[in-house]
Design a protein with these regions (language model features):
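ABC-family P-loop ATPase nucleotide-binding domain
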Residues: 1-14, 223-231
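ABC family nucleotide-binding domain
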Residues: 4-6, 11-209, 213-216
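Residue-level detector of flexible, active-site-proximal loop/helix-junction positions
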Residues: 80, 220, 228
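H-loop (His-switch) and adjacent beta-strand-loop-beta switch element
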Residues: 213-225
Length: 231
């Protein structure tokens, strides 16, 4: 029997905009299985990134239910949700989201320290080595290329040994060569941790690597396809 890692039931999201409350996602029903790699695709503004943020508890659903690993994220308080996300998920963003005043090593180690891991810096060093950046450990983000910054972000996402990996346009700001390297590392981290991977992408080649692709349009699921059909 396949275990569900992520489950959304009639999930909705509304956000405040200049013209008042705007509904971003409408009645999303979606289940992601353990070990599955799911791609979210669709035109700009279709709700892909918002759906990913909902799955990770980075946005709170304004309707319906969002569950991860059997836990109802919609019923958690802010502190409980932050702890749960920190312990179970790794998130990679298009714009890296590194702290500019911290070195590469500190960017990876600090979340582990905050989670109470006494071996935070040893684990961070191992993760930087795994992404080929141990020689840049003492450099600050401004001293790193875009590809190197995304490698730091991948190391940070991998460090807590997540059960769920979420990636929002992980190759969006990179050239083709760096993008291919990041994809290889991302899928390697998925395999290393036996994690479920959900990613947002505009890249057809990256979408074809996913087990299943869900296409969004105007905040709704328009269609979905398994890998064979997507190809």
């Amino acid at each position: 029997m396949t275990t569900s890692v992520l489950e959304l039931q009639n999930a909705a999201l509304s956000l405040d905009g200049n013209a008042g409350r705007v509904k971003i996602l409408h009645d999303i029903n979606l289940t992601v299985a353990q070990g599955e790699t799911l791609g979210l695709v669709g035109p700009s503004g279709s709700g892909k990134s918002s759906l990913l943020m909902l799955m990770g508890g980075l946005e709170q659903a304004t309707g319906g239910k969002v569950a991860a690993l059997g836990h109802d994220l919609t019923s958690m308080g802010e502190d409980e949700l932050a702890r749960f996300r920190r312990d179970t998920m790794g998130v990679v963003f298009q714009n890296f989201h590194l702290i500019p005043t911290m070195t590469a090593l500190e960017n990876v180690a600090t979340p582990l320290e905050l989670a109470g891991h006494k071996d935070a810096f040893q684990r961070a060093e191992a993760e930087l080595e795994a992404v080929g950046l141990s020689h840049r450990r003492d450099h600050y983000p401004a001293q790193l290329s875009g590809g190197e910054q995304q490698r730091v972000a991948l190391a940070r996402a991998s460090a807590p040994r997540p059960q769920i990996l979420l990636a929002d346009e992980p190759t969006g700001n990179l050239d083709e060569t760096n993008g291919e390297a990041i994809v290889e590392l991302l899928f390697g981290l998925r395999d290393k941790h036996g994690a479920t991977l959900v990613l947002v992408t505009h890249s057809h080649s990256l979408a074809r690597k996913c087990d299943r692709v869900v296409r969004l349009r105007d905040g709704r699921i328009a269609d979905e396809a398994q890998r064979e059909a997507a190809e």
